[in-house]
Amino acid sequence: MYKIKYQIEAVFLIREIDVAEGKSSKGESFLKGTFVLTIAGFVVKVIGSLNWIFVSRILGGEGIGLYQMAFPIYFFAMTVSQAGVPVAISIITAERVALRDIYGAKRVFRISMMLMLFTGIFFSILTYLAADWLIDWQLIRDARAYKAVVVLAPTVFFVTLLASSRGYLQGWQRMTPTAVSQIVEQIFRVVTMIVLASVLMPWGLDYEAAGASLGAFAGAVTGLIVLIYFHIRLERDIARDYGTDLKPLSGADYESRCSIIRRIFKLALPVSAASIMLPVVSNLDLMIVPQRLEAAGYSISEATELFGYLNGMAVPLVNLATILTASMAMSIVPAISESRVLGDSTRVYNQTAASVRISNFVCFPAFVIVFMLATPISSLIYNAPGAGPAVMISAVSIILLGLHQVSTGILQGLGHPTIPMVNMLLAAAAKVFLNWHLTAIPWLGIMGAAWATAADMGVAALINLYFIYRFIGYRIEFLQLLKTICAAGIMAASVYAFYTWTMAWWQIAAISTFGAVFFGCGIYVTAMILLR
């Protein structure tokens, strides 16, 4: 072991991050992994956004409706079958690699692939059969969505194999394969959707929607092919660095097949449950928020419009602003898992501190931008200045969601995936309570729902941080947090001044908004350096 110092003075105020010495077959640091996953996440979102412009024009409102009827069924089957698998496999693989049990790491992959093979087949068949049941029981109201559901069934199988492959490579702390496969998967998905939806247009809307659904299948298959290539590269590196005659460990460190399967389920199930909870909470929002807006005195059409401002405009901006922390949550899991199994508590602490610092460093200026420029951003992106209040309050969620994502990854790396899941459940209960009461207050309205969402993230993040403190003694450094808040405050003042002055001078919203963003970011980085 030795220490590599990441001199990141302008950003993280000189934090020394411990990194274990590894051979060339080992992966990237979690900072590099975070970077490549962030770039991939941004590219995927941009491609996806452009895709909807073209697909919406081809399918029209009715065709999109058929597609949207089918996709939640696929999403649910995909979530149940594999949502927590990459996390589970990455944790177990990272532990084996840390113990230099390369035979054991490869064995984990073989067992997980066999498990996912059967799981994928089961849920693919279930999805296929569900198409008939859902239409017969009138849960899908339009029978024309049948074809779109059926063609998604085999996709579930390939997605489960993708999950296992990504988890194994992430366990080696190789995040580039995941990033590249995500981009390739999205490209092929989008191209297939557009081409098939166009080609099948003469056959009718049901065939068009089915063609669009086949995009997910094409993306999953090509993504898997990309991962196979990276697996071959990894095997070559392992053979070079560790030889081909790998032996299993003996004694206490050996893990039986049944033990590995049990651990995969034990680690994956809480993550899957948390993933399922997200659409459940969204559906609760759908039932509660418009109803309580009506109770506040809004008409049905006004309530629908305000709900669209929050869920359709504000929430996507929050998710976009937290791409980096979502990526970090993925890359920190195997890094902390490796440090934990080696018993290196100092390294676990430093990795935790670095990830929280990075989260705050990125999320605070993102909060300032969205909060201070909520109405201009809403006007430029959505042509909906009325979304400004919902976007402004939702900006608070950026900081809290970033902390929640990172703290969840830390707890998963520490081997406690159930804790974030339970915390999400408690936070969701708080959100439902606040949604019901705050949204019905006339002077709050949709801003009450936005505050409820922020509280949801805040409660989950704070409880996560409490458990992190209990396990490793880490608490957020107050002085560093204060410096970040001061720098963000200076940035907020500069953004306001720049936007106000340029709007008064040029009266061009786009120049004023984007100029304020870049000017504010420059001021923020400068302030962080001066406050170092």
Please state what every model-predicted region is.
Residues 176, 187-230, 418, 428-462, ...:
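Membrane-interface helix-loop junctions in multi-pass transport and translocation proteins
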Residues 122-141, 365-383:
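Short membrane-interface helical motifs at transmembrane helix boundaries
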Residues 159-181, 396-426:
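Membrane-interface junctions at transmembrane-helix termini in multi-pass inner-membrane proteins
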Residues 140-164, 368, 383-407:
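Alpha-helical transmembrane segments of multi-pass membrane proteins
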Residues 1-47, 103, 107, 250-275, ...:
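N-terminal membrane topogenesis motif
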